[in-house]
Each structure stands twice: as C-alpha cells, then as structure tokens.
Amino acid sequence: MAREFSLEKTRNIGIMAHIDAGKTTTTERILFYTGRIHKIGETHEGASQMDWMEQEQERGITITSAATTAQWKGYRVNIIDTPGHVDFTVEVERSLRVLDGAVAVLDAQSGVEPQTETVWRQATTYGVPRVVFVNKMDKIGADFLYSVGTLHERLAANAHPIQLPIGAEDTFEGIIDLIEMNALYYEDDLGNDPHIKEIPADLKDLADEYRGKLVEAVAELDEELMMKYLEGEEITKEELKAGIRKGTLNVEFYPVVCGTAFKNKGVQPMLDAVLDYLPAPTDVPAINGVLPDGEEAARHADDSEPFSSLAFKVMTDPYVGRLTFFRVYSGTLNSGSYVQNSTKGKRERVGRILQMHANHREEISIVYAGDIAAAVGLKDTTTGDTLCDEKEQIILESMEFPEPVIQVAIEPKSKADQDKMGQALAKLAEEDPTFRAETDQETGQTLISGMGELHLDILVDRMRREFRVEANVGDPQVSYRETFRKSAQVEGKFVRQSGGRGQYGHVWIEFGPNEEGKGFEFENAIVGGVVPREYIPAVQAGLEGALDNGVLAGYPLIDIKAKLYDGSYHDVDSNEMAFKVAASMALRNAAKKCDPVILEPMMAVEVVIPEEYLGDIMGNITSRRGRVDGMEARGNAQVVRAFVPLANMFGYATHLRSGTQGRGVYTMQFDHYEEVPKSIAEEIIKANGGNNKED
C-alpha cells in the first residue's frame, strides 16, 4: 500500500497550554473542521472527544495525551493533546519528545500563565518550534496585544502577531491577516465559511503598524531580507511567509494568531499556520541513537531507512487490552511482524496497528516514517523504549523522568480488593513512570508515591473506576531514618535455661558512625575463636535484621559500622538463633551510648516567581526550616534554589499558588538526609511511642 501523505505533507503537533486556556476545545474544533467529527463536543458539558477517560470528563481537565490523526488541505496532521496541570508534567514531557512542533494556546484575558511558562521551558529544552494561538477572544477582559506582551515579558520570546483581532469580548467578529492584508469575518455559528473583506477603516493604521513590525522582525533573522528591507524594497508575501517559516523552524521566531475555539472563530487560519510554519518530519534534525557496539548513529525520516521508533505511552484499553503508542522515526512497519525492543533486549510481535481518533480507532496494515500510531500485542514494552528492526538495532535517546516526591499509605477496603489492588497498582505503574507502588517492610502497608497530591488522587480514582478496587488512603508521610553520632563498645548477651537444651549467645560489638551514603558495614575482628566461625554470619544477619527497626522511633538505621571483637559461647547451648538475638540486643543497648539521631529527607527545591514576590517567598522558605542556596534571574523571573525538609513541603503548591496569584511554579526532588532538630525529633519519637525500650 503506497503512502497516502508524503513526509513533507505530514505534521506531528502537540497542543499545549495552561490548565483552562481552552486546549481541549481547540483540538475538538480542529477535528470538526478537518472532518473527523460531525458533532462538536463541549468540554464544559463533559462530552469532549479528546477527554475520553471518565475522570477527565468529570473534572474538565485532560490527564492523558490522546493521539489523534486529522486531514487538512491535503496534509495529515497528527495531534497530541497534552495536560496543562503541573502534576502531569511527565505527560507533557513525553509528548514533546515525539512531536515536531506545537501550538501554544493562551487565554486572551490572562496571557502567559505559570503552567505556560513550565511547558514553554520544556518545549525549549526539546527544541520544539511553536505557533501561538491566543484563544477565548470572546471572553470578558480579552486583550490580544496584552497577551502578546506577556510572551515578551514572561518568556522573553520573539513572538509577533501575523493576525490582529477585529473587536474583542462580545464584539469579536473576525481577524485581520497581516500577510495577505485582508479581513476574515465569521458570520455563521459554526464558522465554516468566513467571508474575506477589506480591512475596516478604523483598524487600517493599526494593521499597517503591525505589518511593519512583522516585516522588520522577520528581516532581522534573514540577511537577504534585511538587505532588501534596508534598501526600502518591497518584501513580497511569499518571501515574508518563507522568512516566518525559517525563523519558526529554527526556534527563533513564534508567529501569533488569534480566535475563539468555543465560538468557532479563527480555528481554520490557525490550522493553516500549522501547515505553513510548523515542521514536517523531514525539517527536524535526525534522531540520534546508539548501536549495539556503542557507536553513535542517526536515523533520518525516510521510509527506506531501517525501522526505528520510540514508545511514548502505554495505556490499558477496555476493548483491546494493552495499547502502546509509538512514533516512527525511520522505515516502515507491517502489522503482524516482529520488532526488537532494543532497550530491554527482547523480541516483540506487533499484533495489530491502530490509528487513533480520540476515542474511536481504525485498523491499518502499515505505518511509515513520521507516523504516530498504537500497537496491540506488545508485552514487555514500556514508556521510553526503542522498537526497531531486528537486523539493524539501535537504542534511541530515551526520556528522563523525575523521582516521585510524595508518598501515601493505601489499603484495600476488603479482602476481595486485596489481590485486585496489587494488579491495578502494577498496571498503573506500567503506564506512568513517575508512579511507584511498594510494600513498607516495617509496617506491611502498601505505599504509593507520585509527583503531587492531585497526581495520586487521580490514580486512586482510576483504580476505583477502571479496576473496581475500593481503597482507603492515608495522609502523606515522610520517610525518616536514624543513625549514630558516637562510637561505643556494647555487650549483647542472650541466655535461656529452661530444662533440657538452653540458648546461649554472647557478643561484644563496637558500633560507630559511617560516612554518609556508605550504608551498614560489618567487620569481624574475632581472634582465637571466642565466637566460633560458624556463628559470625548469624551475628551479621541479626544486626541487619535489627537495622530495619531503629532504636529511637523505629525508622531504619543507616550509615553505621559494627565491629564484632569479643564474646563467648557454650558447647551445647549456643546456636545461630541465640547469636542472632544477642546481636540485636547489642544494637538495642547501643541506643544509650552511641548518641542516636533522627534524619529527615531534604529536598532540593527550585521556585520560579515574578520578582515582586521574591521577599515573601524567601521568608516563607525560611519559615519552613529551609536554607536558600542560591538565586538567579531568568528572563524577568527570579529563580530561588533552596534545601527544605520534605516534612515542611506538604501543601506548598497551594501556598505558592495563592501567594503569587498562580504565577509561581516550583519543582522539588530528594537531595540528601540531614539531622532533625532536637525539639522535632522528640515529637517524632513521642508520636511513634518511643522505641528505646529494654528487650
């Protein structure tokens, strides 16, 4: 089967924005105008095509990026809808990784918002060219030029309008095209047939001014155009479009368009801008990878090259089971064929290949370079894995995901839920690399960890809906540790005599602090067999077992040394068990002599805020027992780096949001352990009922 759309006529784009800027509605309208939907679904009525998880429809937010394919003016446009909430940055990161270009949607009233800044930075990291769509021009307070100004101030972006709105709020009726220098009026409700007219007289001067600014900005990026511009020659329409395309592809220029997706105005010209200015797979640099012999190699967007692709999302579908979304970088793949998962070193069979249209799917027999599709039948492939030709193997650059930062205990409500919960957690962890589930060795509780409170809420909710598992969720917890600050020699003696054979184990151990991060080190310094050699492993095992349940508040002991140097034994009564118990008693006794302390996880926190909030934010970090480690200006924002105890970071997202009118963002990850101040340590010990008791 021949290719339906050439590579040059393929666009892989993401729609990215702050939560509530109208991203999903914009995608809906694209699907409507490109003929994939016959009835428009509204997000605020909970009937949107892209938001197909029940929860997304209820909350009106997009959680998973659904990939959809559409056609416009002889081009194929593959669209990935990305979430706008900070807890789902992993979804945004992984979509950006496989896209060639993006449409950044802004709310015309707010302009650039905090999450826009986060997503914009991620897109810049991946070198993704962007077109900006200023949406909601019909909203009260909509201000197009203010929104464009925020692109300059908050993102230091070289963004310029290629359109101007005609009217705003209730009177928004069309747009001025600054390249064609004409006006488009929307007169029917569905916006199917805009009328082309002359630019209204009262806006002619403004249009001329912004056309002049556009020409100047484009000329600055191109020497030939600059020469023409300086010599006063006319720059043609074609030259202007070519200049905008070149600047956009080089991520040096961002064309800005406007409209209102909800009222069906301005969506088709935005689609035209996607075709005109965003890259085809052939316009972006070839993807790099590593061959089995360690050599670096590139794969170009070309059907004749060996097949290579990247799995960027795994989902469980109620009808077809496990779906693996993948982006083809080179070559072709037929359904039913075998591929190599070079990341895991496993052979996989691609059962069927589906092209996704929001929630409806169509089966296809072959995919080509530049395509985005979903495979059914892959068993071992997870997010970030490379799938490639078995004979021409390569591992493509993968994605890096942050470590989870928040942990809660979860327990099934009934015995029936118990087994199902394990399976559900395993499935969710497979789909989401920033989610972990593990069993706490000390309490036997199941702990789940993720990127934030909303992230975990949604996952627990999905467990209930998709896997029918009811669970109780505890409060967020901190994983404390314990260690020793001093060295001391301690005795442990276990003697039981109760008729017949007794128990006898006796050791002298020197305990002391170890270097940070070195863990537990055991040294056998017994001379002359005072403790027989066969009991030494039992002493070590007894200590290791006792470490998990510390001496102050029951938290694991880390970074300590133990040197076994003396002891005694009994010919008949000594056995492994007795020496195990003696060793653990020695560790308990060390609590009195070795100055044990509690350690807490310290997070490396980075807060990005507008300058005017700097004083308040610094004060708040100090009040949370944080230490500011450094500051720098980024664009017109301030970046504050600090170390803050995890225990004091709960609820910080809410505080930051309200304290900066939603303009501050922060990231945090675990950095190191540090001693807890005495007063707080006492509270922790009290809360845990104290562990320093005689055995």
UniProtKB/Swiss-Prot annotation:
Residues 8-282 form the tr-type G domain. GO terms for molecular function: GTP binding; GTPase activity; translation elongation factor activity. It comes from the Bacteria. GTP binds at residues 17-24, 81-85, 135-138. Keywords: Cytoplasm, Elongation factor, GTP-binding, Nucleotide-binding, Protein biosynthesis. One of its GO terms (biological process) is ribosome disassembly. Belongs to the TRAFAC class translation factor GTPase superfamily. Classic translation factor GTPase family. EF-G/EF-2 subfamily. NCBIfam families: EF-G (TIGR00484), PRK12740.1-3 (NF009379), PRK12740.1-5 (NF009381), small_GTP (TIGR00231). This is Elongation factor G. It comes from Listeria monocytogenes serovar 1/2a (strain ATCC BAA-679 / EGD-e). The lineage of its organism: Bacteria, Bacillati, Bacillota, Bacilli, Bacillales.
